From Swiss-Prot:
UniProt GO MF annotations: metal ion binding
Name assigned to this protein: Metallothionein type 2b
Cellular compartments per GO CC: cytoplasm; nucleus
Induction note: Up-regulated by cadmium treatment.
Disulphide-bonded residues: none
Coiled-coil residue windows: none
Organism, scientific name: Colocasia esculenta
Length: 84
């Protein structure tokens, strides 16, 4: 689910990162949960995209950004369905 084009995962962990997938994009891991890491090897190439398309995507993301504020709260959040 993607409701927010900015850089904030609005959860109790207040984790900020790139490519917001919506509120609580980053899971809140408890002390008894195990975190695993996987590696992916990509074999092959895709045709290059036009630079105009990439620019539009970046410009669109800048319009709807959420920022992590004090006390793990969201400020300047304009992702309507998300209500961070």
């Amino acid at each position: 689910m993607s409701c927010c084009g900015g850089n904030c995962g609005c959860g109790s962990g207040c984790q900020c990162g790139n490519g917001c997938g919506g509120c609580k994009m980053f899971p809140d891991f408890g002390s008894d949960e195990k975190i695993t890491t996987t590696h992916t090897l990509v074999l092959g190439f895709a045709p290059a995209k036009g630079s105009v398309e990439g620019f539009e995507m970046v410009a669109g993301a800048a319009e709807n950004d959420c920022k992590c504020g004090s006390n793990c709260s969201c400020t300047d959040c304009r992702c309507d369905p998300c209500n961070c």
